[in-house]
């Protein structure tokens, strides 16, 4: 467990002050709403893109779904940067989320490449394969953030258990 008596060598994901700021800011709720919405848009869009690639039908629906997914991605990136500023004091690349932010830029680059392909009239299949590449990187990036969420929960449980042990020890 991070920064616990059992494993003091692991750095905590949040300091007490950062955790308090994280819990107090409305941007945490914004992220908590946008992340599942983006995942839902991803799931629907993935089905539509694969359907188009297999059948050649549904290009418009797949395109609209990719645009919605991309808009959600850009929105969550901007609001996430604001969240990082509030919690960690910098807009991006806070040490606790450095690699997630680095990989996020790859995800954004591929989604932006899709927009380029769409707006410059590249072949439909090329557009869809770029979208699939963007989605593959998104899945990896989402996994990174889910891992951090798990670490944060374990840290909170560890700190709560430590507080409980300290309280019981003082009685």
UniProtKB/Swiss-Prot annotation:
Disulfide bonds: none annotated. Pathway: Porphyrin-containing compound metabolism; bacteriochlorophyll biosynthesis (light-independent). It is an enzyme of class 4 (lyase). This is 2-vinyl bacteriochlorophyllide hydratase. GO terms for biological process: bacteriochlorophyll biosynthetic process; light-independent bacteriochlorophyll biosynthetic process; photosynthesis, dark reaction. InterPro entries: BCHF. Coiled coil: none annotated. Keywords: Bacteriochlorophyll biosynthesis, Chlorophyll biosynthesis, Lyase, Photosynthesis. One of its GO terms (molecular function) is hydro-lyase activity. It comes from the Bacteria. Its EC number is 4.2.1.-.
């Amino acid at each position: 467990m991070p920064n616990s008596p059992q494993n003091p060598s692991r750095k905590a994901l949040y300091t007490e002050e950062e955790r308090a700021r994280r819990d107090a800011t409305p941007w945490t709720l914004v992220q908590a709403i946008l992340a599942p919405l983006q995942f839902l848009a991803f799931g629907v869009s993935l089905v539509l893109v694969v359907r188009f690639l297999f059948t050649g039908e549904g290009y418009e629906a797949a395109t609209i779904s990719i645009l919605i997914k991309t808009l959600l991605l850009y929105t969550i990136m901007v609001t996430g940067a604001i969240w990082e500023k509030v919690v960690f004091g910098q807009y991006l690349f806070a040490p606790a989320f450095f690699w997630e932010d680095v990989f996020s830029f790859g995800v954004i680059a591929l989604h932006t490449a899709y927009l380029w392909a769409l707006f410059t009239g590249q072949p439909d299949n090329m557009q869809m394969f770029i979208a699939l590449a963007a989605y593959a990187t998104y899945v990896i990036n989402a996994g990174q953030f889910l891992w951090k969420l798990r670490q944060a929960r374990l840290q909170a449980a560890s700190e709560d258990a430590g507080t409980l042990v300290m309280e019981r020890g003082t009685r």
